[in-house]
Each structure stands twice: as C-alpha cells, then as structure tokens.
C-alpha cells in the first residue's frame, strides 16, 4: 500500500470531512454574530461524493474519519453518510464533532449506522453564559445529548471546551469536577486566531497552564493517563479517584505539528493539509478520476509546511506567513 507521506516523514491516516458550513449557532470563536454567507446546496459535497472519495482514500492508508461542520447534524442525510462510510471495511473509526443540539434525537440512529464516538462542543456549564457564547444555544439540549450518547454507547465521549479569557475561565474547576462522576474526557482547547482579523483574539487568549493552576488551587491531585481512543494531540490527565479525564490541547503555545497525521476536506470539496495554511486543492471535479484526484491530494501533502507558525513569540505575537482566510465553520472544526 502506498501511504500518504509528506517530505518530513509524517504519514497521514486520518481525515476530517466537513459535510456542511451551515450551523444553527454563532459561537464567538467560530462565526461572526451576523453570520456568514453559506454555500448553496449544490456547492456542497453529496453523500455519494463523500463515500466515493473515501473508497479511494482508504487504498492509501486513511483509516480514521471525523465528520465535522458547521454543524453536521443539520444534514438531513447525515445518518446515510455515516452508513456509507461504515460500509467501507478499511475505515476503523468514524467520529463526529457536534454542538449536540440535535444529538439526543439522532444518536441512536447514528450509532446503528456505524458511528463510533462523539466530540461535543460545550464551553460553559451555566445556561445563560452558554447561550451568550453560542449566541442562542440551549445548555439542556447539550446535556440531553450527552446522556443519550452514553445510553447508546458512543464512547469515549469528549467535551471540547475552548478557554476564553473573561468569559468561561472561571469555570475551569466546574469542568474538572464534571469528570469526577462521569466517564467523560473534557478537553480544554486554546483560543486560536482562525479567520480573525488583526490581533483581537489575543484579548481572549489564555495559556493552558491555567488548568493546572486551577487543579492545584482546588486541591485536586492529578496524574497522566495513557492514550484515549482517538485522543489526537490532547495530553490527558485524571484527577485521582475520578471516573473521567481531562486533557489540554495547545495549538498556539506548544504546537504538535511534528506528529500531525491529518488532512481536511472542506464541505465544498477542497483538500487542506494544514488547518492554519491557506493552500487548498479543489478535488471535487476529479472524484471519479482517481489518478488525478490522488495527484492533487499528494501535492497538498507535499506542500504541507513543517509547522503552522501559529506559535506565540515572547511578546505574545503571532507569526504567520499564510494565515487561513476561512472561518473555522468554513473549514471544519
């Protein structure tokens, strides 16, 4: 089997497929309050295109798929997409990232179709604050979605918490306490300058050392834990005696580019080899032309930078030669 390897020796076996750029929320770190101009439906990859693409990609070593958006559960055919991917025997793991507004309704059907596990965005445990950060989200719907995911066996369940200075950084201990009674992995993620103009993001950025300081202040003893299924770049820990775990993902202060194994496919059919790099290859016209398609995929990988240059300098400045122009919802979170 010919593997997808870049010039730095990184083998790519994981792809994140955005199935829509649409979302029913407007999270402050993902989309402007006024929203975005969404792709016309005919510009979005169809179920058959997604499945055909993956039937080819598995021949080159891709074996893990994460479905993203926008909000992927807005796709009326999301269960059929999962079922189509689940029918490809070489795919070992199918996961989804969701805001969970519709997860309670769809979790059982998704599990039956072949979904392995779920990541859920949850940036506050206070209903009013959650509504403010998401610009309209209902916390109880997320909690119901978590419960349903537990019931149907979508494990491990991971909760993605973007740490935002002045908005939810006083809830760190609450999230840590959440892991004591639930077998859930809470992942604290640094606020990233994706698609943001200027340097205003720095006003909301907090280094993740804050998490460990909160543990110490609360008197929580914690220890590293072994790899969690699909853990990716997260460094994971467990508070002694807790059922669940917590992790930290720091793409800004300590990037993990040297071990990056992922590609991204946008909802409109562009391959991105790096989240924070503008270069994209339009593969949609060639989904039925495997030779040309794989030439483009390999070209994207060949041009992948050694790192995304989003690391902080001493003065907390971002160095970036080619920052991405897309918002996170347009790339696939």
From Swiss-Prot:
Question: Which gene is this protein's source?
Answer: moaA
Q: Which PROSITE patterns match?
A: MOAA_NIFB_PQQE (PS01305), RADICAL_SAM (PS51918)
The name this protein goes by in its record: GTP 3',8-cyclase
Query: Subunit structure, briefly?
Result: Monomer and homodimer.
Binding-site residues, [4Fe-4S] cluster 2: 257, 260, 274
UniProt cross-references to Pfam families, sorted A to Z: Fer4_12 (PF13353), Mob_synth_C (PF06463), Radical_SAM (PF04055)
* Alphabetical GO biological process terms: Mo-molybdopterin cofactor biosynthetic process
* Protein purpose: Catalyzes the cyclization of GTP to (8S)-3',8-cyclo-7,8-dihydroguanosine 5'-triphosphate.
UniProt: S-adenosyl-L-methionine binding residues? 29, 70, 121, 192
Annotated residues for binding of GTP: 16, 66, 97, 158, 262-264
| Cofactor binding note | Binds 2 [4Fe-4S] clusters. Binds 1 [4Fe-4S] cluster coordinated with 3 cysteines and an exchangeable S-adenosyl-L-methionine and 1 [4Fe-4S] cluster coordinated with 3 cysteines and the GTP-derived substrate.
What is its pathway? Cofactor biosynthesis; molybdopterin biosynthesis
Fetch the CDD domains from UniProt: Radical_SAM, Twitch_MoaA
Tell me the organism.
Answer: Listeria monocytogenes serovar 1/2a (strain ATCC BAA-679 / EGD-e)
Instruction: Describe the family membership recorded for this protein in Swiss-Prot or TrEMBL.
Output: Belongs to the radical SAM superfamily. MoaA family.
Q: Which residues bind [4Fe-4S] cluster 1?
A: 23, 27, 30
Please give the InterPro entries that the UniProt record associates with this protein.
Answer: Aldolase_TIM (IPR013785), Elp3/MiaA/NifB-like_rSAM (IPR006638), MoaA (IPR013483), MoaA_NifB_PqqE_Fe-S-bd_CS (IPR000385), MoaA_twitch (IPR010505), MoCo_biosynth_MoaA/MoaC (IPR050105), rSAM (IPR007197)
Which principal EC class is assigned to this enzyme?
lyase
Task: Enumerate the catalysed reactions.
Answer: GTP + AH2 + S-adenosyl-L-methionine = (8S)-3',8-cyclo-7,8-dihydroguanosine 5'-triphosphate + 5'-deoxyadenosine + L-methionine + A + H(+)
């Amino acid at each position: 089997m010919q593997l997808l390897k870049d010039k730095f020796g990184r083998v790519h076996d994981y792809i994140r497929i955005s199935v829509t750029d649409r979302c029913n929320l407007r999270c402050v770190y993902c989309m402007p309050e006024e929203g975005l101009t969404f792709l016309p439906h005919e510009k979005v990859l169809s179920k058959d295109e997604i499945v055909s693409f993956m039937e080819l990609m598995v021949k080159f070593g891709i074996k893990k798929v994460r479905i993203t958006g926008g909000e992927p559960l807005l796709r009326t055919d999301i269960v059929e997409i999962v079922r189509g991917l689940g029918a490809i025997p070489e795919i070992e793991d199918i996961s989804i990232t969701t805001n969970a507004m519709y997860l309670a309704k769809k979790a059982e059907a998704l599990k039956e179709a072949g979904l392995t596990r779920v990541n859920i965005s949850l940036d506050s445990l206070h209903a009013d604050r959650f509504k403010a950060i998401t610009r309209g989200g209902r916390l109880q719907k997320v909690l119901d979605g978590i419960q349903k995911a537990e019931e149907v066996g979508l494990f491990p369940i991971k909760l993605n918490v973007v740490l935002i200075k002045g908005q939810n950084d006083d809830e760190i201990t609450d999230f840590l306490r959440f892991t004591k009674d639930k077998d859930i992995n809470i992942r604290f993620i640094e606020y990233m300058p994706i698609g943001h103009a200027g340097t205003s993001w720095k006003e909301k950025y907090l280094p993740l050392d804050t998490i460990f300081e909160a543990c110490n202040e609360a008197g929580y003893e914690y220890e590293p834990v072994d790899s969690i299924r699909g853990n990716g770049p997260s460094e994971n820990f467990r508070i002694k005696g807790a059922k669940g775990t917590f992790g930290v993902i720091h793409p800004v202060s300590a990037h993990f580019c040297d071990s990056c194994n992922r590609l991204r496919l946008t909802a409109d059919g562009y391959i991105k080899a790096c989240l924070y790099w503008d270069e994209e290859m339009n593969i949609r016209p060639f989904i039925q032309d495997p030779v040309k398609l794989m030439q483009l995929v390999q070209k994207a990988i060949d041009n992948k930078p050694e790192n995304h240059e989003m690391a902080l300098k001493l003065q907390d400045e971002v160095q970036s030669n080619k920052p991405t122009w897309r918002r996170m919802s347009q790339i696939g979170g």
